[in-house]
Amino acid sequence: MGNDEAKKKDHKFQIDYGFRIYKIYNNSPFKMLGVKELSDFIIPPKELSSSNLTFEYWLKEKINEKINIKIYSLLTRKMKEFEITVNEDDNKGGILGCEVNYENYISAQTKLLHVISIKNKSFAQDNVFLIKDQDYIIGLKSLNDGKLYSLNTDKFKELIIEFSEVLSRNKGKECELYVYNVKRGAKVILIKMPNNKKFSLGCDVAYGKIHEFPMKSENDEDEEKKGLKD
């Protein structure tokens, strides 16, 4: 499915967990269905909870077959079902043509950082182009080791500190910052970290109930899908 998350055998398929979609490739069956990066989760079938199969191997058994896949949307806080055809793995995004991370889709509503102010002439303003009030930081990937740091974790507060440390450790290197914007949707921002000894992103962030992932009505969602088809 794009990274190793769907292949790991130590995933215990838990209630409220699914594969968060971080990137959808052009070959993905989800591309024209209106499935969205960062806000949508692929929900594994319940039958896997009593099976030794990983989600990846379950999909491989369904190659060229039509299957029903449930998607949980953070935007509507609801589950939807799509019929897709499982394609051969072409090594770009795997069988489903997307990169994913195994996460709790309920805690994802609040485990993120809302950008509430940006310092003038800061790295956040001049290099990352963050937008106050509109942007929510979801995670970070170091392109040096390929590791994804999602803020949606049981150790959320500890990871906020580690998040800053990851930025500092990658001085002079490239990282991908995963950001959700309330008007534009998902943004993957490629940034090259400066070599400054003291680095600061230069923005103030907040989290908690009043800063949770923004919601949209189902009517808004339907209008967006209609626009994709037209």
Segments from the language model and where they lie:
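Intrinsically disordered, Ser/Thr/Pro/Gly-rich linkers and terminal tails that flank
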Residues: 1-230
